[in-house]
């Protein structure tokens, strides 16, 4: 297939991203400053980190809406472990394991109950979120400040740059490369696509469906934990509400990136570009003085438009056939 046709959606997203930055740059010229542009990504790049493995979950025919609560639970757990005197490196490792366990819980419940993933992860969203609030209350960190007192080396980590690139953005780029190779260049990635197209056929074809689902959900949980660590470092405090606003932007990024909400197709490159597109949209609106409520409403509207547009695109032949029959009936 012609590369231009194969990556036409990603090319369109890249062009739209450039146009968006230039448009907001006209409103606020500061956004055209390369340093401002790069460092402004630190405010939203964790959404992209979570959106990458979430793409694999959705392509497999699944769904996970609990990652925001997982981020909050991992963040407050990191703070509590540090508060109890645990060495920070060990606390971070345990936090990453906790994120993976949250993902494994999701996968296990989905596989062994057969209940719709949306329903299961809705339940675990409240389970993990409630656990985070309980842990926060027990630690006396119910206020906006959360748990602080982290070493300067840790709090500086998410605010420093390497070769002029902010560290969170470097993490995102590394994650992009990892998940792109995993999804588009390995047998596991091929299995994810096949499961999304038909889990039953994949099962009959001796594809390890359960193992693949456990892996993609665990990676989403682990990515949520990575996002939690970066957010705690960036803000300098561990709070249970970190990640609470990630749900809509992350899902919008995955769907806008080209993933079929019913599974079977999707693109890591598309999700990465869409995450930047959604992030800069929110950032640009904020710099233009638009209230957060309107920004959230626009993100929701964007998600609806994309879902409807993708649905129309997938069923365009049936729509054209129906329109042709209607026109012929009127002419007769």
Swiss-Prot record:
Its main location: membrane. One of its GO terms (molecular function) is transmembrane transporter activity. It comes from the Bacteria. It is found in: Cell inner membrane. GO terms for cellular component: plasma membrane. Belongs to the binding-protein-dependent transport system permease family. AraH/RbsC subfamily. PANTHER family: ABC TRANSPORTER PERMEASE PROTEIN YPHD-RELATED-RELATED, AUTOINDUCER 2 IMPORT SYSTEM PERMEASE PROTEIN LSRD. The complex is composed of two ATP-binding proteins (LsrA), two transmembrane proteins (LsrC and LsrD) and a solute-binding protein (LsrB). This is Autoinducer 2 import system permease protein LsrD. The gene is lsrD.
């Amino acid at each position: 297939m012609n590369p231009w046709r194969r990556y036409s959606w990603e090319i369109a997203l890249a062009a739209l991203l450039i146009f968006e930055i230039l448009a907001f740059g006209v409103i606020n010229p500061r956004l055209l400053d390369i340093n401002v542009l790069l460092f402004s990504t630190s405010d939203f790049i964790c959404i992209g980190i979570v959106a990458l493995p979430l793409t694999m979950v959705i392509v497999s025919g699944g769904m996970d809406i609990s990652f925001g609560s997982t981020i909050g639970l991992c963040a407050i757990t990191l703070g509590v472990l540090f508060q109890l005197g645990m060495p920070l490196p060990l606390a971070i490792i345990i936090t990453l394991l906790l994120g993976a366990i949250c993902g494994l819980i999701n996968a296990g419940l989905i596989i062994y109950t057969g209940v719709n993933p949306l329903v299961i992860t809705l339940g675990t969203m409240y389970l993990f979120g409630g656990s985070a609030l309980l842990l926060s209350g027990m630690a006396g960190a119910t206020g906006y400040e959360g748990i602080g007192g982290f070493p300067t080396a840790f709090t500086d980590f998410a605010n420093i740059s390497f070769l002029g690139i902010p560290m969170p953005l470097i993490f995102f780029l590394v994650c992009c490369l990892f998940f792109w190779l995993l999804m588009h260049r390995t047998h596991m990635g091929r299995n994810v696509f096949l499961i999304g197209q038909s889990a039953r056929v994949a099962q009959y074809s001796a594809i390890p469906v359960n193992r693949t689902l456990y892996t993609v959900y665990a990676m989403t949980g682990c990515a949520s934990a990575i996002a939690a660590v970066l957010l705690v470092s960036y803000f300098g405090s561990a709070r249970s509400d970190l990640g609470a606003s990630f749900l809509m932007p992350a899902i919008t990024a995955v769907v806008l990136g080209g993933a079929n909400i019913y599974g079977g197709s999707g693109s890591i490159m598309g999700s990465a570009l869409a995450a930047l597109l959604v992030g800069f949209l929110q950032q640009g609106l904020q710099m233009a003085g638009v209230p957060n409520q309107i920004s959230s409403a626009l993100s929701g509207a964007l998600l609806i438009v994309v879902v409807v547009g993708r649905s129309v695109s997938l069923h365009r032949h049936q729509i054209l056939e129906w329109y042709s029959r209607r026109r012929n009936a009127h002419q007769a």
